[in-house]
Amino acid sequence: MILRRRLIKLLFATLPAYQVLGVSSVFGNSNVTDEDHILAVLINTLRSLNNHVCEKAADKLEKRVHSFNSYTLHLRYGMLDSLDAKKISEALKSVHQNHNIRLTSFSVSYNPTLGQDGAKSILSSLPKNIGELGMVGCNLSDVTGSYFIEFIRKSKNLNMICIEENNFSQKMKDKILNLRQQKTSCTIIV
């Protein structure tokens, strides 16, 4: 079993993402699921960032309990910048494109170098059925606030969004908080 996991890990690390999706035919159907293949792109991307927080998240994704085709991804205090965010965004798009897997909770809180472009990239890549989102303390301004408004409006299952400790004006905070009237089941913390 351990050898099989190591072989799969090696295969994921050496093959391009589009080739990884066929691994179950090589190893049989025992413990390798389609869900593992889908997340391989994201796991490899996180590892490629050479960052302790991302490495830990990749390990967690590899070892997670398979339940209801869902996962969480928390990258708090990862010193992620806009380039890292773009790579993560592309991997998220790949994971959620034509696949039935749910990202229940996502956080890049306390990444002050994320930037407006990084936040925009991530927001555009998150699935509409996400349950929780955190971008606390990311040094974001009103420009990003408008992206959050659009994201909250389009989200279908969002029940919590935490975006406090950023640089939003009071006017922008009020605009975001006014969305509670439309999204009554969503807790919005700005």
Where are these regions (language model features)?
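Secretory targeting signals
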Residues: 1-3
